[in-house]
Amino acid sequence: NKRTRTAYSRSQLFELEKEFHFDKYISRPRRVELASSLNLTERHIKIWFQNRRMKWKKME
């Protein structure tokens, strides 16, 4: 049974991209902070960063 895909809002994506631009790897404390401010789970943020790094590598 597949989990449903998370839909990120524009503001969430903006913050995630901003954070990614600053650092490709997010620290646990920062992840906790971002999760509560963006109303997402830490897991969502961790996975978003993993996926974003793959996208970034492909674009290089």
UniProtKB/Swiss-Prot annotation:
GO terms for molecular function: DNA-binding transcription factor activity, RNA polymerase II-specific; RNA polymerase II cis-regulatory region sequence-specific DNA binding. GO terms for biological process: positive regulation of transcription by RNA polymerase II. The keyword DNA-binding applies. It comes from the Eukaryota. It is found in: Nucleus. InterPro entries: HD (IPR001356), HD_metazoa (IPR020479), Homeobox_CS (IPR017970), Homeodomain-like_sf (IPR009057), HTH_motif (IPR000047). The keyword DNA-binding applies. GO terms for cellular component: nucleus. Keywords: Developmental protein, DNA-binding, Homeobox, Nucleus. Residues 1-60 bind DNA. This is Homeobox protein HTR-A2.
